[in-house]
């Protein structure tokens, strides 16, 4: 069960903010003035998450004293608090009825008034809501009127939705720079991340040159001039990279995590392939072949690696087990059978209910 703790800057004191160990707590965010915290918890009903505001405070002696206020009772299921608005008067909430259907709500911090910002019928995904820097809109990832998760902005006054970019792939993550000059987005293209920055003043997107792999954990510097992110790939273990925007420079690797003496040539970059399934559906897969000095002229035995989920995806990430098998002479075949994420909603729904065994036939 998730719990929250507040530590002093020196680390000399740690305070339990949750104070309800029997409940699950989901983090929302800090208010702009640093005096309040938004969060969700199932304290009153284990099947329902409600939204709370925690007032952070301390006595003159430095003793911690804070209190929770129930802001809004959830409708049932996941009702997860998010960011405060730039002026601190509102909080975003994501209502999560299912993996393929979400609603974005805006709560008034003073009154608890609840506004559903994305009313709809049927199943539509709305994910990763974030406030626009001016507080007049909300950015969101959605497959509204489309097959892929694309980045859109919802106008708070009118409720109108405008797409920022509509690539034919999922936008998997994004961040907005302080001041609102840049919007950085990571796009899942056939399983590999493509990183781009969009000037919010209307300029053309800028693509970053990065190796084959996956971008995670993006964050802008305080001045908005640099993007910092975590990156890993088949030939790159997890490291921190930085990208200076607007200067025509390439992303630069900042850290160099240890590989325990394993040489670079031991790590293999896979080939993206496709094959026809029983009904003609094209199935994407990553094919890893042993290094040439290990493989020689013989055909290697193959390890087939179907991912779990089922709504998940095999991606070109750093995998020490794969590296071991490859250097022992095994090839690895990692298919993304129907039902996998990353290839659009229709592809993801192709193994639903009675079609579940079709994904097995893909193998």
Would you name each region that the model predicts?
Residues 28-36, 82-90, 128-137, 174-182, ...:
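Blade-terminus and WD-like Trp-Asp/Gly-His loop motifs, strongest in beta-propeller folds
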Residues 42, 143, 188, 200, ...:
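Residue-level recognition of strand-loop junctions within catalytic nucleotide-signaling folds
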Residues 3-9, 13-15, 27-37:
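Hydrophobic or amphipathic alpha-helical targeting/insertion segments
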Residues 1, 42-47, 97-100, 144-147, ...:
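Short glycine/acidic-enriched loop and turn motifs that connect beta-strands
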Residues 217-363:
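Serine-hydrolase catalytic core recognition
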Residues 7-24, 44-46, 52-80, 87, ...:
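Multi-bladed beta-propeller domains
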